[in-house]
Amino acid sequence: MANYAIFDEQYYLASYPWVKPAIDAGVIRSGREHFEKFGQAAGLTKVSRYFDENAYLAVNTDVAPFVRTVNPNGPFASGLDHFIQFGYDEGQRRSAVSPEYSEDFYLANNSELRSFIGPNAPFKSGYQHFIQFGAKEGRFGTSFFEPEYLKENPDIVPFVNSGALRTGREHYLNFGKNEPSRSATFVGSRSNDILTGVGVGNTELIGVEVGIDPRGNRQYESFGTNEFDVLIGSPGADTFVLGVPATAGNVTPTPLYLGNGQATIRNFDIENDFIQLQGTSLSSYNLAPVGNNLSIQTRAGDVLGVIEGGANLGLIFQESNGNGTFLIG
């Protein structure tokens, strides 16, 4: 049975503006009706900012031979046509649908949802939850911290709302990463993550699980225990986060990676990059060369992070953030 849960009315009408006059004239009642009666069979595919026709066919190679853009005699007008008829309800097997969504990341970053996702659970994939609820709740589908980017860059919001851009991430990867004035944050999960910064401006790398509270503010949802993350710097100015301020999820500023866990920092540039720590000064920490690396430890010897190739770095206090954290570089 066809499942149209993916359909986004606003995005469809923005993508195919010639449909709107037919609605205004009363010929059809909605973009959804147009798509079901005409657009789907015609091979229209822009029904959601979180579905990409090319990406779906590239990953689902068993589907491509049955799509009419590849095989004129195929039973499906498009990869989307297959997804609506079968793929959506096949769950995680068909969850690679867009560069704007990663099933592995969504499940790792929203670990509280795991019991609700599976063959016999309310949602057959994380993608189903994301499409029906997650995106509306401010959850995001990749390590790019989408809600904060849109909040800090209101000039691009109209382009996202209109459908000219699918997401803030699309803007950043196509334009923002080349603009020194744009900042971006990449976040991980409570599992082991590899994060790579992108861009010539300010990039923040946070290996732990981060979300937003009901007011749209950042909150930290894990603190690095039993997490072993790799944070890879960008060409721009990076901040590698090993300590966080107080938020709705933690009442006091908190160091990350206490106990079993640590961040491995790569591509650290002493001229441009910073490391964020909890507290007000370096007096609570030891910076100890270990082989070719520099180990960042608490006074008790708990390793929070290691800078690869940083044994000879002379890191010093740079500035206080005024929120219970400070920067060294």
Where are the predicted features?
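Acidic, glycine-rich calcium-binding repeat modules characteristic of RTX/beta-roll
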Residues: 1, 23-27, 184-283
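Charge-rich, low-complexity intrinsically disordered regions
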Residues: 1-186
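Generic structural signal for beta-strand residues in well-ordered domains
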Residues: 5, 49, 99, 123, ...
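Generic structural signal for residues positioned in beta-strands
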Residues: 129, 171, 185, 204, ...
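Low-complexity acidic/polar repeat-biased segments
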Residues: 281, 287-329
